[in-house]
Amino acid sequence: MVVEANKKELICSFCSKKQHEVKKLIAGPAVFICDECIDLCMDIMKEENKVALKQITSSIPTPQKICTILNDYIVGQDQAKKILAVAVYNHYKRLEYIQSGNNEVELNKSNILLIGPTGSGKTLLAQTLAKILDVPFSMADATSLTEAGYVGEDVENILLRLLIAAEFNIAKAQKGIIYIDEVDKIARKSENPSITRDVSGEGVQQALLKIMEGTVASVPPQGGRKHPQQDFVQLDTSNILFICGGAFMGIDSIITARTNNSSIGFAANININREKNNSEILQALEIEDLTKFGLIPEFIGRLPIVTTLDELDKEALITILTKPKNAIVKQYQKQFELDDAELIIENSALEAIAEKALAKKTGARGLRSILEHLLLDSMYKVAELKKHRVTITKEVVNGLVEPIMTSLISTKSNKKQPVLEYIPA
């Protein structure tokens, strides 16, 4: 409520100092605030930022410890884990260095680009890193983004998701991680600069440049376009770590064409008879390949750390099914246990499931849908029957027979079967 001294002189709504006692008095909707109160607010916010950062940086595990934790949840991808662990560790150590006030050497932010086939673990790597570091994490799909003014999501909505994840704690959000998936889908349509509008390709890359590099962005707390009169939240993106991921289908042919052109004369005959797989080809990735694919040089420049993920083979998929802490088979066995039932999946069945996922080219992402389809009828029945054991064999996976259901009450031994560990033949 605005209070006036002697019906004339305005006063600060917070400290009650009169207008002539302060240097500035700033008016707002039905309130006034003086320059001294603004300075006090700024000091409080700076102190809160220091506390928030100290909580994050004081508990940063070393790169080796980060890798050890990642190994509990993610199978394979050792090189990608190592690169990510070092990058994330250095990023948060950089924040600690900046907060200390030491400006002797300016440390730049290093965002990350993950390249790998569908279901190779790009999203899971980013999610697990955020969980390890206990920082706000948000994920966005690049395919839904468009330039401002066109139908689709504005890039500022990515920052809004991070704010929501941080419960609108701005200081905490400014130290978070943003994962932008399907970034290969915003590649421009040709290698040459676009003459006409490319609102979902090159236009989105241009829009992402500033927030990825570091800027104070105006974030609409209620979403962008439906509430034009809302007050905006100012969010500094300078210390937000951006991780971009994509399958980049077809980039292997760009790499192959480049490497073949570079091999002439006698060098062309070396390894000509050895067919390289997709993972080996990606190891030879260069910046120029990304440019030819359709990423603009400025966008690539904001992603100095580039790492590739290997395509998962049959053994890796079986390990994903059984080994990690949150392995898919363990999850389904726990669900059956909640219904007082047991689930047994034979080794031959695990192999058949992995082969199906490979045939569908869905990687680890396809394993859950295959199991869900196999176990649907069993889960439907055991909820009523209770005290039953469901066994999945290779024949069940191949659709030749139904899952085998046996009553635990009628069997001589009611001992719970241990979780099966896959042992290759």
Curated annotation (Swiss-Prot):
SMART domains: AAA, ClpB_D2-small, zf-C4_ClpX
Residues engaged in binding Zn(2+): C12, C15, C34, C37
Limits of the ClpX-type ZB domain: 1-53
Record flagged with keyword Protease: no
PROSITE patterns named among the record's database cross-references: CLPX_ZB
Gene Ontology annotations of biological process type: cell division; proteolysis involved in protein catabolic process
GO CC terms of this entry: HslUV protease complex
Alphabetized UniProt keyword annotations: ATP-binding, Chaperone, Metal-binding, Nucleotide-binding, Zinc
The keyword Cell cycle belongs to this UniProt entry's keyword annotation: no
Molecular function as annotated in GO: ATP binding; ATP hydrolysis activity; ATP-dependent protein folding chaperone; protein dimerization activity; unfolded protein binding; zinc ion binding
Residues that bind ATP: P117, T118, G119, S120, G121, K122, T123, L124
InterPro entries: AAA+_ATPase, ATP-dep_Clp_protease_ClpX, ATPase_AAA_core, Clp_ATPase_C, Clp_protease_ATP-bd_su_ClpX, ClpX_bact, P-loop_NTPase, Znf_CppX_C4
Subunit field text: Component of the ClpX-ClpP complex. Forms a hexameric ring that, in the presence of ATP, binds to fourteen ClpP subunits assembled into a disk-like structure with a central cavity, resembling the structure of eukaryotic proteasomes.
PANTHER family to which the protein is assigned, alphabetical: ATP-DEPENDENT CLP PROTEASE ATP-BINDING SUBUNIT CLPX-LIKE, MITOCHONDRIAL (PTHR48102:SF7), ATP-DEPENDENT CLP PROTEASE ATP-BINDING SUBUNIT CLPX-LIKE, MITOCHONDRIAL-RELATED (PTHR48102)
Protein's job: ATP-dependent specificity component of the Clp protease. It directs the protease to specific substrates. Can perform chaperone functions in the absence of ClpP.
Family: Belongs to the ClpX chaperone family.
Protein name per Swiss-Prot or TrEMBL: ATP-dependent Clp protease ATP-binding subunit ClpX
Organism: Rickettsia canadensis (strain McKiel)
Gene: clpX
